[in-house]
Amino acid sequence: MNKKCQGCGIILQTEDPNKEGYTTNIENKVCTRCFRLKNYGEYKITQRTNIDYKKILSKITDEDLVIYVTSILNLETKYLQNFKNCILVVTKLDILPKSLKENKLKAKISLLKNYNNIKDIILVSSINNYNIDNLYNTIKKYRMKNNYFVGATNSGKSTLINKLINNYTDKNIIVTTSAYPSTTLDTINIELEGINIIDTPGLLNEGSVINKITEKQIKTINPKKEIKPRTYQIKKEGTLVIDDIARINYKTSEGSMIIYIANEVPIIRVGETNPRLKNYPPKKISIKKGEDLVIEDLCFIKFTQNTELNINIDKEIKIQTRKTII
């Protein structure tokens, strides 16, 4: 019987150090890649596509429950409608200002994600152990055959599963977590008091900023504590540059924007003639009052008025608007 890595789910092997699942001793619980990532922060790139993940997700039946995990920063739910029975779990609640009311957030998210297959929406913080009991009891309530945790890379899915393991079992299992894509490589089965939990690899979000920035930047954009929203008063033709990732040029009259982004990410004002990021062709975006602008896995921006923007950014990074959640 093949033995799986407890960290990423890949089958362990001792023959080829250049292939996935390599370990020096088959008795080890984790592969070398997971060991070095956890203990030394060394990340080894693994090429994956959503074709690989779709094969795994095709095993999910109508008798199963999908716990669809998404970060509060972007609320990605691309594959959510593929499943019959879902709980939508919004993670990283702790990174938003404490002044925000959970019930109002949940109500606005419910309007954005008004799908018939969603049984519940639960906002959680794995770091603060907030609403974890609520999630666990909700999973138990439905008593489905299997309980699949599904979500995009960097959604906080594996961190959430580790919190469940820590809270409700005495098993010495730690799913490998990191800010990098493709940390989990195959399914990981975990039994919690008779409930079958299945962690799946993080879905690759083709429009994510993570695919286009450096490893150092990936660490920086991942919020580690409560975000301090940054408000900018902007005049016509005013320009902001976000960490050599995005250049935002304000085309309309005076107004303000409030940026929700990791505190460590640098944002600077530049003049119109400054060439930074002008090598990217501008995307023209129209924003209505009461909408957010979302740059996938980087930030969301709230505007106080109707606005016309030019945004210089890699063409493959997804930008979208939505009704504001704040």
Tell where the protein language model's regions lie, with residue ranges.
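Helix-rich effector regions associated with P-loop NTPase G domains
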Residues: 1-66, 73, 84-87, 93, ...
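Glycine-rich nucleotide phosphate-binding loop and flanking beta-alpha elements
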Residues: 74-76, 156, 167, 204
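Canonical P-loop GTPase G-domain recognition
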Residues: 95-155, 161-174, 178
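Alpha-helix C-terminal capping segments
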Residues: 57-61, 78-84, 112-113, 138-142, ...
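Conserved Rossmann-like nucleotide-binding pocket used by diverse enzymes
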Residues: 68, 89, 122
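Conserved beta-strand elements of the Class I
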Residues: 65-68, 148
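Residues that form or flank phosphate/diphosphate-binding pockets in enzymes
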Residues: 77-78, 130
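Short hydrophobic alpha-helical runs that function as membrane-insertion/retention elements
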Residues: 87-88, 148
